[in-house]
Structure formats: structure tokens, C-alpha cells
UniProtKB/Swiss-Prot annotation:
Keyword Cell membrane tagged: no
Summary of the function given for this chain in its UniProt record: One of the primary rRNA binding proteins, it binds directly to 16S rRNA central domain where it helps coordinate assembly of the platform of the 30S subunit.
UniProt xrefs under NCBIfam families: PRK00136.1
GO biological process per UniProt: translation
Naturally occurring in which organism (per UniProt): Macrococcus caseolyticus (strain JCSC5402) (Macrococcoides caseolyticum)
Subunit structure comment from the entry: Part of the 30S ribosomal subunit. Contacts proteins S5 and S12.
Name of protein: Small ribosomal subunit protein uS8
Gene symbol of the encoding locus: rpsH
Coiled-coil regions listed: none
Keywords assigned: Ribonucleoprotein, Ribosomal protein, RNA-binding, rRNA-binding
Gene Ontology MF: a single term: structural constituent of ribosome
Top-level taxonomic group: Bacteria
């Protein structure tokens, strides 16, 4: 059976692993998932990201990050634009997540960017998810 929403699947896997405080998680690779994983690493939500090539599509291995007392760095993930209801925003309409404490993932013509990066480059796009 094919997966109807691979981004929601990725966010659910991260959320579930984070809730039970797993050190790492693995998920099937795709170009958009690689871009999202790199943003999570760059923004400090995950420790590191590895790409493992195999005969099929490859695997993304993400190492989750936790605070000093084993508190979660990722407190919430929410899918915004879904296959049944796409959500688009212009550059000046891009949402701020928790007044800038979180990030919004935006799929643009220049790839997947955070809301801050898209605002700086003055490009809008599809609002994929909120992470805080």
C-alpha cells in the first residue's frame, strides 16, 4: 500500500520517538524528508542526521536531542497543509510559531525553508508544518 502523506508519517515518527525518549529513529528517505531533516538539525531540534543508502530508496537516521534533565527539545509538531486541504501563504502572510520560538516549514520554489528564511527572501509557498 502506498503512503498518502509521507511528511505526516515523518512527523508522526519523530513525535512518537520523542514521546518515549528514543535516542534515534529511522525512516524511509525522500528528497523533501532530507530537506526537513536538515532544517531540524540546523535549527537545533535534533542532534544529527545520517543518510544510509540501500538498494531501494535509502534511510534517514535521526538522533533526537534532549535537555539536561532529559526534557524534550521538540515539544510539539503539527502538520498544516494536508493532501485534502493545501495551505499556501504569501511572504508577508507567513505565520510566526509561538511568536518566533518555533518554526514553520514552508515548501517554496527554492526548496523547503523555515518561515524566517522565506520571509527574508520574500517568497511564499505551501506551509507544511509547525514545530516548536
Amino acid at each position: 500500500m502506498t503512503m498518502s502523506d509521507p511528511i505526516a508519517d515523518m512527523l508522526t515518527r519523530v513525535r512518537n520517538a520523542n514521546m518515549v525518549r528514543h535516542e534515534k529513529l529511522e525512516l524511509p528517505a525522500s528528497n523533501i524528508k532530507k530537506e526537513i531533516a536538515e532544517i531540524l538539525k540546523r535549527e537545533g531540534f535534533v542532534k544529527s542526521v545520517e543518510y544510509i543508502e540501500d538498494d531501494k530508496q535509502g534511510v534517514i537516521r535521526m538522533f533526537l536531542k534532549y535537555g539536561a534533565n532529559n526534557e524534550r527539545v521538540i515539544t510539539g509538531l503539527k502538520r498544516i497543509s494536508k493532501p485534502g486541504l493545501r495551505v499556501y501563504a504569501k511572504a508577508d502572510e507567513l505565520p510566526k510559531v509561538l511568536n518566533g520560538l518555533g518554526i514553520a516549514l514552508v515548501s517554496t520554489s527554492e526548496g523547503v525553508l523555515t518561515d524566517k528564511e522565506a520571509r527574508q527572501r520574500n517568497i511564499g509557498g505551501e506551509v507544511l508544518a509547525y514545530i516548536w
